A protein has these predicted regions:
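Structural recognition of the beta-strand scaffold that forms the well-ordered cores
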Residues: 126-128, 149-151, 186-194
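Soluble non-cytosolic domains of exported or imported proteins
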Residues: 57-68, 132-141, 178, 182-186
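Extracellular/periplasmic catalytic domains that process cell-envelope and extracellular macromolecules
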Residues: 79-80, 117-122, 182-186
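Active-site scaffold of zinc-dependent metalloenzymes
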Residues: 92-139, 152
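Metalloprotease/metallohydrolase-associated module, dominated by Zn2+-dependent proteases
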Residues: 166-231
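Catalytic Zn2+-binding segment of zinc metalloproteases
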Residues: 146-163, 187
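Residues that cap or delimit alpha-helices
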Residues: 71-79, 156, 161, 165
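A metal-dependent hydrolase signature that marks the N-terminal structural subdomain at the beginning
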Residues: 2-114, 207-214, 225-231
Length: 231
């Protein structure tokens, strides 16, 4: 049974949610949702990448068309964060060095190499491993990495109404605070839950490893943040 205080808290929460989802933001540029260019195989020059990447045989390319096929299904609401982003089938050089193995996916806005230098040819890339494709997890891996891109490109300088003192990024990271897990990785996993077109056996590595679940309220807040910050 609801007590009066619990009912008041619920009504306050619902009212805040309605305000969050209905807030009107002055659009910049065209009113239509901007979209990334349709990915194409020739966007990635694998010969140059092979020559540029130091220390590891990391660029695969055998499943490049599969990766681009998955990239073409990214929801339109997330695409404003992906302007100029290229998708690469392979193992990111810096992540490979750090992990000692090939990461399923990596988002790299700065072009990091295994020698800890950055600014290389693969700046603003999302890498998807061949294993992610072979195991049928590429779509979830891509959404996770796109989540990192959204947080990096859209949430850092965006603010919820009446909460202008703290960025959307920081507010959302607070919702994913955890004693053992990196909240940024948990937040990226939440994009898989919130935006995946399938619901069976989602690949949410960090949620699974740390037995973490995002509440419906947090997922609603995440969707509202994407809507707000992509305008």
């Amino acid at each position: 049974m609801f007590t009066a205080s619990k009912l008041l808290a619920l009504l306050t929460s619902l009212f805040a949610t309605v305000l969050l989802t209905l807030v009107i933001v002055a659009p910049r540029g065209e009113a239509d949702t901007p979209s990334i260019d349709s990915p194409s195989v020739d966007k990635v020059d694998f010969r140059l990448l092979h020559e540029a990447v130091s220390g590891h045989q990391v660029v695969d390319g055998r499943y490049q068309e599969d990766v681009l096929g998955v990239a073409s299904t990214i929801p339109a609401s997330l695409q404003p964060a992906l302007k100029g982003t290229k998708f690469v089938n392979g193992c990111h050089p810096w992540a490979t060095k750090e992990l000692g193995s090939c990461a399923f996916g990596t988002y790299d806005p700065e072009g990091w190499d295994s020698d800890d230098t950055h600014g290389h040819e693969w700046t603003n890339t999302i890498w998807v491993s061949s294993q992610a494709v072979r195991t049928g997890k590429a779509s979830d891996v891509v959404l996770h990495e796109v989540g990192h891109a959204v947080v990096h490109n859209l949430f850092d300088d965006c603010y919820f109404p009446q909460q202008a003192e703290v960025s959307v990024k920081e507010l959302l990271l607070q919702s994913f605070a955890h004693g053992g897990a990196n909240p940024a990785e948990l937040l990226a996993d939440a994009f898989v839950v919130a935006f995946s077109v399938h619901s069976d056996d989602l690949h949410t590595h960090y949620f699974d490893d740390f037995n973490f679940q995002a509440s419906k309220e947090v997922l609603l807040k995440l969707r509202a943040a994407v809507w707000l910050c992509s305008k």
